Amino acid sequence: MEIQLWKKILTPYELAVQEILVKFNHIIMEYRSADMYSPIEAVNGRVKSISSILEKCRKKNIPLEIVTEKVEDIAGIRVICQFVEDIYKVVDIIKKRKDMTIVEEKDYIKNVKPSGYRSYHVIVNYDVETLEGTKTIFVEIQVECPCGGWS
């Protein structure tokens, strides 16, 4: 695939990451403005690099023609919480939102990976407005706590 086509494919994902970061940062701001504790400590995001997408497609035998239908983490958001119990509060916030629809949840807190990895992954459908109209894309939201509070 040539670079111009990749740019066209990835642009909606870049927009989604930017929009969702603004929304989560606004949630933090709302809590703090009300002098309330925010379950969200910080948030960041990224769009997977072309080389990472190609490698994932190769490993999982995904044809490039259907990459946007099969690769659910091209757009990724990481929500950092201070405490483990905040993770579930953030997941509830995501579930109540009308601007994204949960399509899959993976609770690696209750179901710890063999590597010891703990996080809560939520795959959502998210609509972005482009020059070509509305595009619904997958965004993976990882909610985690880097604290040592795992028991």
What function would you assign to each model-found segment?
Residues 10, 43, 80:
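Conserved phosphate/pyrophosphate-binding and hydrolysis machinery centered on Walker-type P-loop NTPases
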Residues 9, 13, 17, 50, ...:
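Generic alpha-helical secondary structure
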Residues 73-77:
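Short amphipathic alpha-helical segments
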Residues 1-31, 140-151:
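An acidic, glycine-/histidine-flanked metal-binding catalytic module
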Residues 20-21, 25-60:
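Surface-exposed, low-hydrophobicity interaction/linker segments
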